[in-house]
Amino acid sequence: MVNFNQFLKQAQSMQKKMQEAQEQMVNARYTGKAGGRLVEITITGRSEVEKVSIDESLLKAEEKEMLEDLIKVAFNDAKQKCDEDSQNSLSGALNGINLPPGFKMPF
């Protein structure tokens, strides 16, 4: 049987580590690139676009469709980096915590 006081201490420790991981994520920045860096998008840990950089060669009417595709690819690249870092941070926060059998985390 799991000692309730021990479980409570582990839960408090886990909560503190998760808060720290979330704070780090808020301050993190992720840059996605597309088209050999013709388009770069930087997002925050909250997936908010912070900066968009577009090479001048793409600012022509005939390049509109390619530019739209590159923006999409660059954003998705940055978002994937953010998601991977978020998952790694939360996994690290839970490292060493012994959860009772059947206990599932909400992520």
From Swiss-Prot:
It is found in: Cytoplasm, Nucleoid. One of its GO terms (molecular function) is DNA binding. One of its GO terms (cellular component) is cytosol. It holds the Pfam family YbaB_DNA_bd. It comes from the Bacteria. Keywords: Cytoplasm, DNA-binding. Homodimer. HAMAP family: DNA_YbaB_EbfC. Belongs to the YbaB/EbfC family. This is Nucleoid-associated protein A1E_05550. It comes from Rickettsia canadensis (strain McKiel).
